[in-house]
């Protein structure tokens, strides 16, 4: 019983530490000195939405909503990726962008 409780506590602590890294990465991306490419931003957006919401749960915007459609497609490409894996990918991509563009 004690081991199971300890394991749950460790997993919970691990999740919160990981969530803190994710939140920090999201804040750092907002401070980039140079704007990343549209492709980089779309990929980052897709990972962010997958990490925070999960699989896409909205209809694709109409043809005339180009920005909305691009964001929908970026998120839809991440469909099926676990929230944890999406969070890891977001953190990794954000670190790469901070190294590339500076904050």
Curated annotation (Swiss-Prot):
CDD domains attached to this UniProt entry: ACBP
GO biological process terms, semicolon-separated = fatty acid metabolic process
Which residues are noted in the entry as an acyl-CoA-binding? 30, 45-49, 67, 71, 90
- Localisation: Endoplasmic reticulum; Golgi apparatus
* Any one GO cellular component localisation term in the record: endoplasmic reticulum
Keyword Ribonucleoprotein found = no
Q: What is this protein called?
A: Acyl-CoA-binding protein
Q: What is the native source organism of this protein?
A: Anas platyrhynchos (Mallard)
Taxonomic lineage of the native organism: Eukaryota, Metazoa, Chordata, Craniata, Vertebrata
Q: Which gene encodes it?
A: DBI
């Amino acid at each position: 019983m004690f081991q199971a409780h300890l394991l749950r506590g460790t997993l919970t602590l691990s999740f919160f530490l990981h969530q803190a890294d994710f939140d920090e990465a999201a804040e750092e991306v907002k401070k980039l000195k140079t704007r990343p490419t549209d492709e980089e931003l779309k990929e980052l957006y897709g990972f962010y939405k997958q990490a925070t919401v999960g699989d896409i749960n909205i209809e694709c915007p109409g043809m005339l909503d180009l920005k909305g459609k691009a964001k929908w497609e970026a998120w839809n490409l991440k469909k099926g990726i676990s929230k944890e894996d999406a969070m890891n990918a977001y953190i990794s991509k954000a670190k790469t962008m901070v190294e590339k563009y500076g904050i």
